[in-house]
Amino acid sequence: MKHNRDAGGVVPARSVFPDLAPAGFDQPAMAKNRTADRLRNLPAVQPRIPETVAATMGHMRRTTLSFSNMHQYGDLFVSLLKARKKIFIDRLHWSLPEAEGMEFDQYDTPLSRWIVVHEFGEILAGIRLTPTTARCGVYSYMLRDAQKGMLESIPTDVLFFKAPVNPRIWEASRVFVSSAVPAHRRLAVQSLLVDQLTRTARDHGATHVIGIVPAIWSRWLRRLDLSAVPVGPKLEIDDITTQCILFTVAKYVN
């Protein structure tokens, strides 16, 4: 899928992440920036799991995988990559690398972390977290590389501002909930997934999480009693309307 869009007109990340501006940086126009105001006032992510939802969790578990701990969880990482292949390649028909029934790409490196919701070995949902400071050869992280024109499937104007490179911002990608999860359990799965996402991001020093999600995200977030702001235009990517959003996890409450 090709895009001929131009990223011209993007502004530095500090223009919309005022708390990430270098010490002593003078930006008098900051107070007039509506996006910055929205981000400053964005409530902390505090996933709320209603009792009715908790009752459907059964034996669900949530795990954060890394290259250094995945050996402790048997074939959970392999199962995650196989679940991603079923979702993104088999169902959505994305053109992605695959081998031995697993989907993977250049961002599945030791720099990333993988959030998995699972039950009795079955993968129910997953997210990949990558620091925006990541570098692996010519690649960094998905949104930044897309903005630089390195990813054919994502347009260069995916963000309203220049993609940030800061240890306090992590990117969420490869977000999915298995189609095998029945409707009455999906909110429980989503709740566990987001809860573990925010905990993991915070534990790694992040104050914000940025990512591209289906444009109906606002309805989904409201069901979880969460808040976020759009930081990019709505885009058609592989026949799905998507949009970049931003969470704050700096004040995450357990």
Language-model segments: which ranges?
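Short amphipathic alpha-helix that is part of the acyltransferase structural core
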Residues: 48-101, 113-124, 131
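A short helix-loop-beta-strand connector motif used in the catalytic cores of GNAT acetyltransferases and
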Residues: 106-116, 135-137
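Acetyl-CoA-dependent GNAT
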Residues: 129-134, 164
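Short, solvent-exposed loop/turn elements at beta->coil junctions and helix N-caps
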Residues: 100-106, 232-235
